Regions:
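Compositionally biased terminal segments of proteins
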Residues: 1-175
Length: 175
């Protein structure tokens, strides 16, 4: 996904519901800091969705937005990309203080993206192969320092088994 596509999704969502705020979470949030990641040959080139948290949002609004710009919508069929709308409880899985480091989008009011170190921390927690590959790209490419990710992991609420697993993943992608 390119930054222009992400901005289009945000603007379409804003036009539909006029939210107080839109938060971009997930991999596409990286485009706010590193637009080049969506270019050909880059890790987000083949990403076709953006995880959006609309504030405020109720189940009826989420259903309406999904029909309008979600997976399988006419919008998605026409553009080739779509939005996935998240529940507010997703914020409980993020590191404490995440909202202090969000990245704004130039030219789009009331929209921000999760900071790169926070995205990487979430991806390491998930641990899917594609997530680990993305984290490795961020670290090896010098886009995010392992120490910054470690700090965000330290600020997450993790059970002991997750702590061991997540920090092992960080060591793995840092080498």
């Amino acid at each position: 996904m390119r930054l222009s596509a992400l901005k289009h999704l945000i603007e379409a969502t804003q036009a539909l519901c006029h939210p107080e705020r839109i938060r971009v979470l997930g991999s596409s949030a990286l485009l706010a800091s590193f637009p080049e990641l969506g270019e050909p040959g880059q890790p987000l080139e083949i990403s076709f969705d953006a995880d959006l948290l609309i504030e405020p949002c109720d189940p009826q609004l989420a259903a309406m937005l999904h029909e309008a710009v979600g997976e399988g919508s006419l919008f998605a069929q026409r553009t080739g990309y779509h939005a996935d709308f998240l529940r507010p409880d997703i914020l409980e899985t993020l590191a404490a203080g995440w909202e202090l480091a969000v990245v704004s989008f130039a030219g789009i009011a009331n929209a921000s993206a999760l900071a790169p170190a926070d995205v990487a921390a979430v991806k390491l927690r998930l641990g899917r192969p594609k997530d680990l590959q993305l984290c490795r790209h961020l670290i090896v490419g010098g886009l995010v320092a392992p120490e910054a990710i470690r700090a965000r992991l330290d600020a997450m609420t993790l059970v002991e088994s997750d702590i061991v697993r997540v920090f092992a993943r960080l060591r793995e992608v840092s080498n």
